[in-house]
């Protein structure tokens, strides 16, 4: 306190002229910087908002808000601007956003020289995870224990475990129907995804489905934390507050509080797993934690420290909970809302599940053409990881087809949503239409090239096989077992804001009556 008092007194005794000079210097510096960035920067050739050229202000303006439709709008604003101004826009002082589908496979192809920007994950969290690793050699080493685990062969071995969670979910639907209560489908399907991915991660599920309203703490925390990343990206100093004790963080920032909750949740689960493993208590199927704790010297993999393990688990559960839950939510709503789609899908499901209590193997479900078309359309339409995923332009820069040059080190990105809703690739993109995936092998293959919900290349989502199995099983069994009736939910409720993952404007509620035939 004495030091603070001395500094305060010293500053107060400075002449007014010095303060005025400092203020003038500050103003002149930022004025010169603004003129340079807007008119003379190498990126000044790209159109866009002048505010975007100066910093995060433009993006923050469109993304940070409270009311539905007044937050998370950058994604949609970019779409409008691209249609007016062309395929490349100024997105920041050192960032260009691209809207050209052909460039997507250059940017995200296997062996791409466009590396991840490490500064992004330092701000957004989990900086020591495999997901955040920007160096391709280290990234390959970090993936070594996980790639075999997420292979289709290994994921197929999880079918019985996943089926137990589907059965538990259906049991909860029965309980609520017997009480005359509708199911909040978004929360239920996110809880189902949470139980599946947490058991795969730790060998023991979080039992989120058992929560009376499907709003267990882990599901709520992830639901509330991800949208706060817009605030953290715009104001990185908020991330620094995470070092404060939780009781202080609660009083300062809800975003920081949620971040604390997530870190403590992951740390507890890791400690519990390590303690159980030391006592010889391990599950009878391979888990993520088990593989992460085994070094692979020949592939350069070393066991991460506690922070590294925590970051891996947080990214795994975040990627496997919200995204799959959202894809299932959007898909199921559109099945119920469109009776033609519903009836055709139900008829096909009856060919492998003659009664509502029948079971079908996952490999049987995969072979159903209309179910497969519904799943693909659900992934396109929901675009659960919709936002742009920036990369850094490699040494030498890149010249776009129109001749404009982007210097090396520039951040450049594209959004999955803009691919999935591109009218040149998908006719009537705002219509949920499974038929677009049943128009012959040549057309379907062309469209499949641009179905990229899991991204592409060496940095694509490891969990693709798990996500597909979860979706096939959840959609097939819920539709076959229940005659679902919407309760007040309309397409307006299913509109969404891009809060890192889609955040719906309303609630998807349905009565879950068991079928008798």
From Swiss-Prot:
Listed InterPro entries: Cyt_P450, Cyt_P450_CS, Cyt_P450_E_grp-I, Cyt_P450_sf, Cytochrome_P450_monoxygenase
CDD domains on file: CYP58-like
A GO biological process held by the record: terpenoid biosynthetic process
Residues making up the signal peptide according to the UniProt record: 1-23
Record EC number: 1.-.-.-
Gene3D superfamilies: Cytochrome P450 (1.10.630.10)
Record pathway: Secondary metabolite biosynthesis; terpenoid biosynthesis
Biotechnology: Yanuthone D is an antibiotic against C.albicans, methicillin-resistant S.aureus (MRSA), and vancomycin-resistant Enterococcus.
Residues the entry annotates as binding heme: 461
Highest taxon of source: Eukaryota
UniProt entry tagged with the keyword Glycoprotein: yes
Enzyme kind, highest EC tier: oxidoreductase
Keywords assigned: Glycoprotein, Heme, Iron, Metal-binding, Monooxygenase, Oxidoreductase, Signal
Glycosylated sites: 338
Cofactor(s) for this UniProt protein: heme
PROSITE patterns, per database record: CYTOCHROME_P450 (PS00086)
GO MF annotations in UniProt: heme binding; iron ion binding; monooxygenase activity; oxidoreductase activity, acting on paired donors, with incorporation or reduction of molecular oxygen
Presence of the UniProt keyword Iron in the record: yes
Annotated TM spans: none
General function of this protein: Cytochrome P450 monooxygenase; part of the gene cluster that mediates the biosynthesis of yanuthone D, a fungal isoprenoid epoxycyclohexenone that acts as an antibiotic against fungi and bacteria. The first step of the pathway is the synthesis of 6-methylsalicylic acid (6-MSA) by the polyketide synthase yanA. 6-MSA is then converted to m-cresol by the decarboxylase yanB. The cytochrome P450 monooxygenase yanC then catalyzes the oxidation of m-cresol to toluquinol.
Family assignment from sequence similarity: Belongs to the cytochrome P450 family.
Name of the protein in its database record: Cytochrome P450 monooxygenase yanH
Lineage start: Eukaryota, Fungi, Dikarya, Ascomycota, Pezizomycotina
Gene giving rise to this polypeptide: yanH
